Amino acid sequence: MKYACVAAVVASIVGVHSCHAQEAVDKAKATAFDARMFGGPLSQKTYACFVRRYDASHLAQHPKQKVSAMKLLVTAEDAPEDKTVNYSFRLGFKYRHRAGNFDSSGFCSHIVAENTGGEIRLGCGVDCEGGGIQLAMKDEKSALIRLERIRNWERNKPDDDASNDLVAGADDKIFRVDRADLHECSELVTDRKELAALRHK
């Protein structure tokens, strides 16, 4: 099942992409990254939503791109008992030549990307060796999603029957997504209490 096992997913993503894990991240730089990602200082639970719908012109210029639309919801939740902040992501997208909505999710931590002048990113992984993504800020209004492979599930279908892998290709390695109102990402949330909280942000 989708959440049946827990693996060291962030560590695996860090290894694949030649990055240093959270222990090596400067706290001040991580705080500055969070302010850019979430559009301000963190509260007890803070969200950021990014959306992109690729138009015909873009897809014509990227004929090998498999994805036609993408939504990203990033969450930061204060965990005072652990004296830390827990980060997670939910990713929803549509395939270009396949019907349906597909989702993935997992946990994240700060990493330092090598050969980028010490750029801070979030390294995010999916349980059970499901791959993952890296998140960076392009500017104040846009984020970049980098992936090699990420497991996803067709929405509202049994896990065992609906598992897929989105594998990076020539036009599917880096996606730019643009900041949007939180309601744009509400479809990615399944918990009723969290959905209600999101709608009141």
What do the PLM-derived regions correspond to, one by one?
Residues 6-15:
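Bacterial N-terminal signal peptides
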Residues 61-110, 184:
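N-terminal glycine/threonine-rich, aromatic-flanked beta-hairpin/loop signature
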Residues 14, 44-45, 71-74, 103, ...:
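Disulfide-bonded cysteine motifs in exported proteins
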Residues 44-51, 82-88, 118-122:
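Short, hydrophobic/aromatic-rich segments at coil-to-beta transitions
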Residues 19-67, 128-130, 138-201:
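Amphipathic/hydrophobic helical signal segments and adjacent flexible N-terminal regions
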